[in-house]
A protein has these predicted regions:
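N-terminal pre-ligand scaffold of iron-sulfur
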Residues: 1-60, 74, 90-120
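Short cysteine clusters
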Residues: 45, 65-68
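Short cysteine/histidine-rich metal-coordination sites, predominantly Zn2+-binding motifs
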Residues: 59-66, 79-88
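M16/MPP (pitrilysin/insulinase) zinc-metallopeptidase core fold and M16-derived inactive scaffolds
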Residues: 72-74, 78
Length: 120
């Protein structure tokens, strides 16, 4: 599927061990930074489609879902622990002139890629 890089955020605005959510060409994108490295993953948990932002956490190479606590590796999207949820979709990410750029598909995402807001 063709994809294009989009300029998303200044690198200095994503502190180490933090995450931030964006919508890029309609795609929900999670940008996480740990030990200086940037990662871009889909901002939709594969368990019950929760968004990782704003309450998710970045620790020890993984992002934790705020809804039920599933953890996914930043470098390959794999689910850690016994839960066995599907891996997170990852996007290519690069830093250019101090900006974080993320490559997302040129096609709009389907509903299966969009997060939902849990009922409270
Ligand atoms: S929705 Fe993420 S762990 Fe359940």
């Amino acid at each position: 599927m063709p994809e294009t890089y989009h300029r998303v955020v200044l690198a200095q605005d994503v502190p180490d061990r933090s995450l931030a959510g964006f919508v890029v060409n309609g795609w929900p994108v999670l940008i996480a930074r740990e030990e200086g490295a940037f990662h871009a993953l889909i901002n939709r948990c594969t368990h019950q489609a929760a968004s990782f932002t704003p309450d998710g956490r970045v620790r020890r190479g993984a992002v934790m879902c705020p809804l039920h606590g599933a953890r996914f590796k930043l470098d390959n999207g794999e689910c850690l622990g016994g839960a066995g949820y599907a891996p997170l979709l990852r996007f290519s990410v690069r830093e250019v002139d101090g900006w974080i750029e993320v490559a997302v598909p040129d096609e709009a995402p389907g509903a299966e890629h969009l997060p939902v807001t849990p009922l409270s």
